[in-house]
Amino acid sequence: MEHFKSIMISNDYATRLSSKCVLSQTYHQNTKHSKRYLMSNMYQSRVLLNSPNFLKATQSPERYFPTQQHFKLNAHSSGLLTEYLDKRRSQVHSPDKDAFIDLNVLSDLFWAAYGKNSQNKRVVPSAGALYPLEIYGIVFNDYENFKKGLYHYNPSTHTLSLLDNGAHVFDISQYIMRYQNMEHPSIIFFITAVFSRATFKYDDRAYRYILLEAGAVAQNISLMATHYNLVSTSIGGTDDFKVEEMLKIDGNHESIVDCVFIAKDREAVL
């Protein structure tokens, strides 16, 4: 009982302290996407984005020091990690609509996202070890005793809680703006942040740390997906309001910060 009371007191204290962090909250709320806003911008920039010269330019370094001494680095070493980094992909060219991900793969993907390691710590770094993120996932396959649907991941028990399995959950056109070649995902991860878990200590700067942590989660998912010959794609084009409504979160205290598609590509062979 005392442990429960201490948690409640800590949460209340964190909430009251975080109320002064208005800059990060204002920024986050004013940069949310909706279908109307995002689609208009995408149409305006389509010609530029499809230009080979533009794509070449974006892959070049911004800074170059021609008058300074240069040192050539060695080629990367061999091993599983370097192989996965080399083979990691974000684009699906030939989606496999009949792909089936078994329960072992599903378990490893959620564990890689935010699970606990052998030292009873999370598998990603977190500023102050505060772990402000929550992991949700839409699973598109039925298993023996496991139904497809929207789930929440509990790292402490390594379990999934079914939140919703209505038809609207699987209609990605309702909450993803652009999903060309991603019409047949196996899993969609939603990474959300409970901001007060970090802002009570770091104030507005906590927002930076939260995004860094979300990036580490997405990279872990990507590497585990590569291990299983899957493609992972981070999606910035979510309709944030629709996603938060589906997750049943308020969008203020807890809000989406990243989305990752997992799919099978017929051309992706390690």
Predicted regions and their residues:
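N-terminal accessory segments that position/regulate proteins before the catalytic core
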Residues: 1-187, 238-270
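Small-aliphatic-rich amphipathic alpha-helix that forms the alpha element of a beta-alpha
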Residues: 109, 135, 189, 195-197, ...
